[in-house]
């Protein structure tokens, strides 16, 4: 990530959501990074696990955890903590996609997470995240001066399509200032 090219001023904190501020992407002619690039640039754990961003939009985020022996559990499949991180990262990607335009006035924070492990996971696993409320509902609450909360639902699947885990993460948009 490059720093701002504008006139010197007080140092800016780095990381999410500051990555989204104007001036953090170099000259105006350069394009903003996509949602997956933002996630990987601001969440070091996602890079540590070598998570792959398959799709990341305001409607859906799909991330993949490759089969890596360094992150296996005692039965040779992905560790529960790695699968949790995969799901949480997918939820973060959809939050960036849906609410990235609100980051100048609110900070997204995960406030609660629940996971259920349904079947044995082996090999590559994929997390698919979807919003549990519409963006319009959440932004309307923010506009009204509230601190909205909204669920993100995540399904974790094996390559054969079997659901190995389900998560719900409650996020909030904490108003700044």
Predicted regions mapped to residue ranges:
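Extreme N-terminal tail/first-helix region
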Residues: 24-44
């Amino acid at each position: 990530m490059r720093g701002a090219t504008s006139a010197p001023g007080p140092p800016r904190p780095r990381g999410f959501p500051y990555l989204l501020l104007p001036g953090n992407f170099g000259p105006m002619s350069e394009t903003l990074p996509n949602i997956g690039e933002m996630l990987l640039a601001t969440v070091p754990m996602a890079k540590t696990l070598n998570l792959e961003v398959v799709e990341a939009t305001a409607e859906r985020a799909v991330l993949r955890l490759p089969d890596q022996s360094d992150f296996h559990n005692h039965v040779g499949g992905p560790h529960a903590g790695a699968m949790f991180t995969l799901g949480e990262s997918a939820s973060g990607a959809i939050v960036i996609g849906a609410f990235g335009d609100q980051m100048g006035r609110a900070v997204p924070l995960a406030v609660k997470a629940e996971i259920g492990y349904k079947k044995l996971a082996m090999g590559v696993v994929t997390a698919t995240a979807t919003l549990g409320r519409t963006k319009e509902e959440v932004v309307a609450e923010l506009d009204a001066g509230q601190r909205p909360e909204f669920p993100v639902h995540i399904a974790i699947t094996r390559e054969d399509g079997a659901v190995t885990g389900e998560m719900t993460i409650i996020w909030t948009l904490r108003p700044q200032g």
